[in-house]
Amino acid sequence: MWLTKSQFAARSAVSLVGTMKDPSDALELLSSRVDQLEKRVYALEHASEAAAPVQEKLFGPAGLATDEIPEVEASGVFPVLGKGLLGVAGAYILRALAESSSLPRSAVAAVAVAYAMAWLVWASRPKVSARFAQLVYSGTSAVILAPMLWELTLHFKTFSPWTSAGILGVYAVLAALLFWKRDVAPVVWIGHCSAALVALSLGIATHALIPFIAVLLLLVSLWEYLAMRGRGGATRHVVVLVCDVAIWGLIFIYSGPANARADYPHLGMAALIGPGCLLWAINGGALAGEVLCLRKTISVFEAIQAVAAFALAVSGVQYFAPNSGAVVLGIACLILASGSYVALFLRILPSENRRNRTVFGFWSAALTLAGVAWTLPPAAAAACLGAGALVAIVIGVRRDIAMLELHGLLFLVAAALISKAPEYAFEELAGSVVAKPGLMLIAAGVCSVLFYAASKERPGERWPLQILHLIPALLAAFALAALIVQGLLGLAAFAVNLGVHHVALIRTFTLCAISAAFAFGGSRWGRLEMTRIAYATLAFVAAKLLFEDLRHGRMEFIAGSIFLFALTLIVVPRLVRMGARVQR
């Protein structure tokens, strides 16, 4: 049996009184013992008060057991799931009514569509604040809509493909509006993902791709707008990828033989080209708005998607309108390239955003190359690209913009390939003698020489930039060598009847002269790439002696070629040292 404080104190006092013979001593001991008990009681009471907030913080408010909390949460999950299942049960009732024909099927279909959208609206109510409930109710809406549209379109034939596509479009817009107004993310996640997948599935099943591609383009437009307003997400990636797949399927199916798509409806050129071009316009316009107006950084997904959309647009034009469509697309590329360069200089380069600068620089160069190639004939294209290369290298060197120097190199290489300058140079130096070079080849060679003369190697450059200087130097060297060989052969034709051995000796002389000149000039002007080309030319001459002079030449001409090569081997290192001394 437990004793109270007063009983314990009384018994202690009695025992003390009983043991003490002097009453005054007993009173003193009793008083001290009572003081000690009061201090202990005070310490215990204040210790419990200090521990109470800690205990409340750890275990919750008083009167609430910790094992009751999971029961409360679990009790909220099961009613939500039950309500969702009730919604699915209602959908089955509507399905039974549609199959029984007791009511007009169109009326039942309209009620079913409204029923699915009502669940989407219910998921966005302010009272439904739990994320789990929003997910369940939005999922219930998608579970009702997807099979309902599938059966009403394919089984009952109540809806045409265009009607089903229109319903999906309204559903997508409703989800976007609810997300925008009430900021309920699960509504737009589930609503748009389900709408995109249902559109792709119905397009494949009905063979009517255009209506459902239109829905997918609407979804892409909605998400591009949401992304510009700072509300993008992973659902945007899903929607865009599904749209890419649908447009690629359209191009793949209709680019094949006609007998392989007998079940598909006939489509005109605009319907076949339009989806890819619209997707490219949507992605490109949104990308430009985000970068130029909102000053955002381009994401990796946006950069890759822009390339994919451009590839789809080009594929559609090349398959279904290779002539007139290519010219229109080329003009559009040139207009966009001009705007891209203006934006690059006025807005992007001053901001020093490296990724935006790289992406816009790549797009500017790519659009320029594509526009020139699709719009102009080969001779005019080569001339324009050569002139553009010279302009780019001059501006890039003066303003110290390495990206423009790279663009100039790309334009120069493209001009050389269009004019077939590398092929002509190889034939002149190692193959069969070709006819006299045309104006286009001469212009390409002159552009290569001027480009290399205008370029400037900076001290301490890394090897990628050194390669950028080496390529125009190679083009200039081989263009000069080919033109010199052609000129010497023309002069020699006045004196002798040219044979293979004459051609081999003239080629050897020209290459040795180019090697010696580049060796001295490279060390004299501090152009390391010229010195490298000088030694590379010696290796080329050695291979030429083995495969041409020794096989087709006469003894005296072989001796002359070997003499020239040996002399060049001796002279080139000395010229390098001589040029270095002159430079100092």
Mark where each language-model region is.
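Alpha-helical multi-pass membrane segments and their bilayer interfacial helix-loop junctions
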Residues: 2-584
